[in-house]
Amino acid sequence: PKYIMGEAMSIGENYDAAKMQALELAKQNLAGQIQTEVTALVENTVANKQLSQEQAASVTQSIMASKNLISQSIGRTIPVMEVYRTLFNKNKEVLVRIAYNSNMAKEAAKKIVREDLEKKGDKLHKDLDKLLGW
């Protein structure tokens, strides 16, 4: 798909606070989806015997640790839907759905995983680049 979608709901005393929190949670949702997709790529590469179990464990560990970094690196998202309602206690409940370009998402994840592996001094990032076509 060209875009991946993330959504989240949040409740706050005022609309702006609830919306900001919902947007951050939606970005976390996107980051989780990206993380899952990259992990699946790595597992598929292991299944095809192109990476050893130890190498895959190292990459997967980097991917799991990078969810917050992926979320932070997500650039401008496209708001697809935003609805709110006032609850009985006067708090605002906001639901947002956002879209993000799939290619940009994958690039962000690749960059973060590559940097993490380089920091560890792991030469695996070069093998991974070749195997996954990064």
Identify what each model region corresponds to.
Residues 1-134:
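Domain-level marker for long, solvent-exposed, non-transmembrane regions
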